[in-house]
Amino acid sequence: MSRSIKKGPFIDLHLLKKVEKAIETGDKKPIRTWSRRSTIFPRMIGLTVAVHNGRQHIPIFISDEMVGHKLGEFAPTRTYRGHSVDKKIKKHY
């Protein structure tokens, strides 16, 4: 058994309070959070969480397959635009 299993899942307290409040009121607005390190709990299924990626908040609808993963896994922080092409290539016929 690895140490991380013994420690158990983690969720920020302020995010947990926001989730509980959204469940009580039945609010369907996205919950904005900067806590990418928080684990997705079963009580969060059906909610929309807007996770910050460093530039903007990305809305993520929580489904049952996501339970146990971290919120940051679903909001990529880096954009890959591809390698630049060499414009000096001449075609030889």
UniProtKB/Swiss-Prot annotation:
One of its GO terms (molecular function) is rRNA binding. Keywords: Ribonucleoprotein, Ribosomal protein, RNA-binding, rRNA-binding. InterPro entries: Ribosomal_uS19, Ribosomal_uS19_bac-type, Ribosomal_uS19_CS, Ribosomal_uS19_SF. It comes from the Bacteria. One of its GO terms (cellular component) is small ribosomal subunit. The keyword Kinase does not apply. The keyword Ribonucleoprotein applies. Protein S19 forms a complex with S13 that binds strongly to the 16S ribosomal RNA. NCBIfam families: rpsS_bact. Belongs to the universal ribosomal protein uS19 family. This is Small ribosomal subunit protein uS19. The gene is rpsS.
